[in-house]
Design a protein with these regions (language model features):
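Charge-patterned, long linear interaction tracts outside catalytic cores
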Residues: 181-208
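Helix-centered, glycine/charged polyanion-binding patches within enzymatic domains
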Residues: 108, 113-180
Length: 208
């Protein structure tokens, strides 16, 4: 029969797969166009290095680190539309343009106060997207009136919480940690989780 590749061989192979292929696979499982999309980020814990490595660098405790996932999430189909993975701390706004460039949103973008920026709202208006982004607490009454006049609704905003449910479902089904040591191995690992999540929902759609 056929020889089964070892785990290390599979890990080496996934590193060689270019990013555009992972993006294409994710899009094929999520669809091409999305009406209402939420944006947010979450963290995946990373396995600690070996005891000998920790001892060699004179550390008494394990090294705390995590991988950050920023994502766009279709609140209607509950699927992940686009993702960005980082292994170093970054502000949520760093990956917004990257994600929006890879996603065709037809109606609404939901986001929490971490995404409250004038340039992002203007970008959404240019793309004919309605931004439902919660304003910061220190916003002036005048600016708040402007935002409300342009379509912001507290009732609609609550749909943003669906992306948090999506992150929770992703971690429950496929684990909240990653075993890769660098971004080249962590990226495909998280992409696989998101793709598997989308496929499981697609299977439910087909057979129900």
């Amino acid at each position: 029969g056929l020889a089964v590749p070892t785990y290390s061989a599979l890990c080496k192979m996934r590193k060689r797969i270019p990013l555009w292929i992972w993006e294409k696979l994710l899009k094929l499982t999520a669809g091409m166009k999305y009406k209402q999309v939420a944006i947010d980020g979450t963290g995946f814990s990373r396995t600690n290095p070996s005891y000998h490595y920790i001892k060699r660098i004179d550390r008494r405790e394990p090294v705390k680190s995590y991988a950050k996932l920023s994502a766009l999430f279709d609140v209607e189909t509950k699927k992940f539309c686009a993702v960005r993975i980082r292994t170093k701390p970054r502000h949520d706004m760093q990956d917004v343009k990257y994600l929006l460039k890879r996603t065709e949103i037809q109606q609404t973008l939901f986001g929490d106060t971490g995404y409250d920026a004038k340039w992002l709202r203007e970008l959404c208006y240019q793309k004919k997207i309605q931004p439902i982004i919660k304003p910061r607490k220190n916003i002036t009454k005048r600016n708040m009136r402007k935002i409300i006049a342009r379509g912001y609704s507290e009732e609609k905003y609550h749909q943003r919480s669906l992306i948090e449910s999506g992150f929770g479902s992703l971690k429950r089904k496929y684990g909240g940690s990653v075993s890769g040591k660098g971004v080249a191995s962590i990226r495909p690992e998280i992409y696989c989780k998101a793709i598997a999540h989308n496929i499981s929902l697609r299977r439910i759609e087909i057979f129900n």
